[in-house]
């Protein structure tokens, strides 16, 4: 079998296709969560604590300036606001995945139905056993 046909067989297996679909859906879901966090969740929180735009929050270590030649030097800052947004996004995605996994586990790991009682064969064997114990089962022609 040639390398191309082996690759084709590998690529067309169900797990690879499922994984590819999962990656595409995950990327789209990530974009939805990003928009949810940046446009819907964080603005009211920022407004509630004093009109703060979380994406612009930063600790400035060195302010922007101009050097001796007139060239602009950008500020050196730690953008913790973006980090807060990313943490909120992560928590939303992690919770959504938790709910999906919990649902899948509930569907796939159902408890088996309780047995409905002994089968007819078991009941018949019990009757035979009890008859033999009580010596009520006699062969034909026996005294």
From Swiss-Prot:
Subcellular location: Cell inner membrane
One of the record's GO molecular function terms: mechanosensitive monoatomic ion channel activity
Recorded topology in the membrane: Multi-pass membrane protein
Top-level division of the source organism's lineage: Bacteria
Annotated transmembrane regions: 16-36, 84-104
GO cellular component, one term: plasma membrane
Keyword list, A-Z: Cell inner membrane, Cell membrane, Ion channel, Ion transport, Membrane, Transmembrane, Transmembrane helix, Transport
Location, primary (coarse class): membrane
Function: Channel that opens in response to stretch forces in the membrane lipid bilayer. May participate in the regulation of osmotic pressure changes within the cell.
Assembly with partners or alone: Homopentamer.
Family: Belongs to the MscL family.
Name of the featured protein: Large-conductance mechanosensitive channel
Gene source species: Xanthomonas euvesicatoria pv. vesicatoria (strain 85-10) (Xanthomonas campestris pv. vesicatoria)
